[in-house]
């Protein structure tokens, strides 16, 4: 197996017309070999004009975090200490958070693969980077509930109904079972 010399969390790009977001990752190997991976999230139930209503200071850090968490799938295939981030920088505290999340989130993977993970994960940061102020995005009081197509989804939905909290379901690649749960509960399911 080729050993990666660097792993770059590349860019993310929103396509409002298609209500999709692509995330790019680049793995570099010796002798200039490169492999690029792309993840794409599609939000078929989100109208194109809604993307402009999300404040940039809310959307940008959200997509940056998504870029980093989705990248775990590629980084664990090509683990390297040389982690790079294109397009934005992290604070020391943010880097420590991502170090911890990757280390603890991949614990079973490291064990199963018999990998030495000591000092393997080190997200880059800039000392001068100041943590941004939390962005305000006032939204109506409501909830977004994962529709896992099982009894827990029904129970959670009933608890939200009982509390008077309006909600919608969301599901990744929904199946007929997801649709049935949504109909049973009487809630809209947003497809992702």
Model-derived features with residue positions:
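RNA-binding accessory domains that recognize and position tRNA/RNA substrates
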Residues: 1-142, 154, 159-188, 192
